[in-house]
């Protein structure tokens, strides 16, 4: 039987960095960097033991970076079109290689990554990497392309704004200009660099990654990247066939057959070749950046090709428009999408002390037909850390939220490295500002470093509270990947208890999960200050589905196993006496 999956997102260059200097805009020598080799057998074993099935190694493909690798045949990147000193992982410079910063020997960087994949597989986990089909770095340059592979734009007709087989869009007759810097910003914080001269040669100028058609994009545009052309004309018309409506209900094999004999834009083939290369390399899946900015037909083509090679590939996409979710799942053949705009945003609102838990069952009801495809998370590299003052200000507030996020549906759960030890992301790293761990700079991750403990990976420097928090995550995640009920049915009992249970409150949430072999009652208290005592009611409808008769049924709390109580069923309705401390959750297992 299929069980829950748990993704551990890790920012690869930060994971093993033990340097604590944390100088804003600091160099690799000053602030340090983590390496592939830091993911030792011991480190991976600890991650696996946390309850993890997949690791998303963020920032692996070779992206623009301010570091001199000329001795390895790599051109220097221009700080005027790089965000931060270490560079954004979403401005990929060479799709057939990996970030040289991550290797102990940059000339052997691909071999070192292959060894990491092998270690990860040996530890019993699968490997996910980023693919960013919407845009590439302004200075894209593949220096290790496989035979027959040419760079993006190499054969483009740059005299045209658009051509179906151009990889980029152009602004003919105009040269690219670096944005006007705002709010005192200077590349590298004003540090000397011979290339930081407010110039970057690009003639003609290309459209920018976020779709800006200006030769001089704005400071808040994705000016370090250029937009990929998928055969969508500047007026939005499509120069490729659209999928017939009935393909919503067809499998990836039918999608693969549909595209097999079609004439397709060149960019489609280029990205298909890139993903096939990494599958052959040993990667088990991809996280697709800004997927909704790329036409859904391309995803049908790409993902059906991926699944033909590896039917078990894990395909996760960043999509933020709920109106498009079903298109990207059914037509685009994505396995999973971020559940940010609905569930994450609702839970964050409650964690910040606003709003009622009532909205959560409403969200789940609206997602009922696609709930398995909506990946749940409370942190990732784009979002604020739970412990940061702009979010909850205290990692403990993540506990009830995490229980709900990880147990309310059959979808995978994702956590971000450091979340399990309450990392607040408090550093001013340079381009990256506090509340998020910087994805642009060389920086240390202090709470996480205490767990790393000089690469013993044993939590030796953690405080008691941090150890307890990590233990909570470990218990919860391990429970979720073993539980059969969490892949079964769901029913909320929250509104019934709001209407019928004295002492129940809108800061509490309750629901049941079950299959033939396991029945669970989940209750969470989101209130940081108030305890609640009430007789939780399990409605007749649930008891009937569970086929339980009147009488007493023992309950065991599943995470810690210490609390044992009973559910009394009388006249077909169940009742459980519950004493909930602030921020406490119970997952009760019904013992038949």
What are these regions (language model features)?
Residues 1-126, 134-145, 149-159, 163-164, ...:
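N-terminal structural segment of carbohydrate-active enzymes
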Residues 137-147, 296-308, 319-350, 424-432:
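Substrate-binding cleft/loops of secretory-pathway carbohydrate-active enzymes
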Residues 4, 51-53, 123-125, 282-284, ...:
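Short, well-ordered coil/turn segments that N-cap beta-strands
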Residues 33-47, 263-279, 398-402:
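Short, acidic/polar
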Residues 2, 18, 65, 80, ...:
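Loop/helix patches that line or flank the sugar-binding groove of alpha-linked glycan CAZymes
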Residues 528-592:
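C-terminal beta-sandwich/jelly-roll accessory domains of carbohydrate-active enzymes
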Residues 6-8, 55-57, 127-129, 286, ...:
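Hydrophobic faces of well-ordered beta-strands that scaffold small-molecule active sites
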Residues 223-325:
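Active-site neighborhood of glycoside hydrolase catalytic domains
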